[in-house]
Amino acid sequence: HFSLTRWFDTFEVSAASYVYNAGSFGAFAASLMMLGVDEMEITTEFQPNGTGAYFDAQDLAVGLSYGRELTDRFRVGLTARYIQQHIWNESAGGLAFDVGTQYQLPFRNLVIAMSMSNFGADMRYNGSDMSVKWDGDANFPNRLVPTRLETEAFALPLNFAFGIAMDLFRAPYARGLVALDAVHPNDNKECIH
């Protein structure tokens, strides 16, 4: 599967995936997602109309997944993903993991599912713009000291989800399904759909 979408003439979203069904061994998958932003002119407090220099930004996620039916009613899946964010000369990267389970009951094909997404270490931006020359006291002429700036680490948007679904009715050419899920993100409000 491959898709490419352009949003608002500035953002480009690309996604590609491949799944291999290994029969009783489960299913293996590879995925690639990318968000790119067109170059934009850099502005500053003193040059609000632009400096003449430009920057771009890009997010990338490359994942490997495995899923398997452990019994005729219980399924599990796991994804390991490398994530990288790039803004101008700085970038941050790290590993994230997703895990999910699904259990199906015989009553109206009731399915109970749970997942945890983006479990991983904090990320931190680093790059060439972090190296600066520092003057300890602007009132006295000093030799500029090479200095390295450091950004704060930030957490990945960890997400827990729980859901249930079941058949309302089944007919030869139609099926009614009702579903409910609850989502608990670490960086936003909980919600129920």
State the predicted function of each range.
Residues 1, 5, 10-193:
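Outer-membrane beta-barrel porins/channels
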